[in-house]
Amino acid sequence: SGVEVHVEVDTGMGRQGVRPGAPLDELLEAMRQAGVGLDGVFTHFCAAEVAHSELTQAQERRFEGAVGQVRTKGLSPKWVHAGSSSSVDNPAQDSPWLVELAKSVGARAMVRSGIALYGYCLVIEGGASVQPRVRPALKPVMTWKTRVLDVRDVTAGETVGYNATFTAAGPMRLAMLPVGYADGLRRELSSTDAKPGGWVMIGGQRAGIVGRISMNLTMVDVSGIEGVRIGDEVVLLGDGVTADDHARLAGTISYEILCGVRAG
């Protein structure tokens, strides 16, 4: 048919792909009969960010077996890939292993760097002795901005936001932003009287989030930033505030923060 595909082998992720052994043999035979070519074979590690992971080592062995099946069938894919951004960053993962495995079927090795293209990568788990290979050099490239919708003053004792979770301790100047959790600004970044929340950047300075983030509105403290006006640019993600900052406050990972940003 002239069609060529990449076949995913489920070596332990348990999500998608064909299992090694008989299921893989059956798929390769069905592809042969249908005239479908094998351009690549790959797998996905479930714990790539964990140093010296026994799970990853077991997956590597299963993938070696699967590539061996491909070789036994006399197939010559162009690509063999099993790496993610965390695989590239994790010093405990043996990069030459993948290269040699690819060579065994006359293929080239490839890594699938996804989140690293945005300048982010999960912290490698495994103790202080583990030195990441690429994470220190990464720089976030995604910027998310909005503009000041309104500016208002509040006096001591006034409350701000739903359920009055924030009470002004003294006079404050607040800026209202036309963005909220419907746009991907996580509600966990809200602040209360007892707990500071997240922040945005206005004029190169931090402006802390005040009260609860609403569906499409957020209040921030600009008391210490001189001359804030309606229409001023506000950085939600960028210089001075990263997806890692949001993730830490929201109890999640930068991947979820970046995927959650929606165009207004």
What are these regions, as identified by a protein language model?
Residues 1-4, 9-147, 154-155:
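Active-site loop/helix belt of alpha/beta enzymes
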Residues 146-148, 207-208:
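Small-residue-enriched segments and motifs
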Residues 153-264:
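C-terminal accessory subdomain/extension
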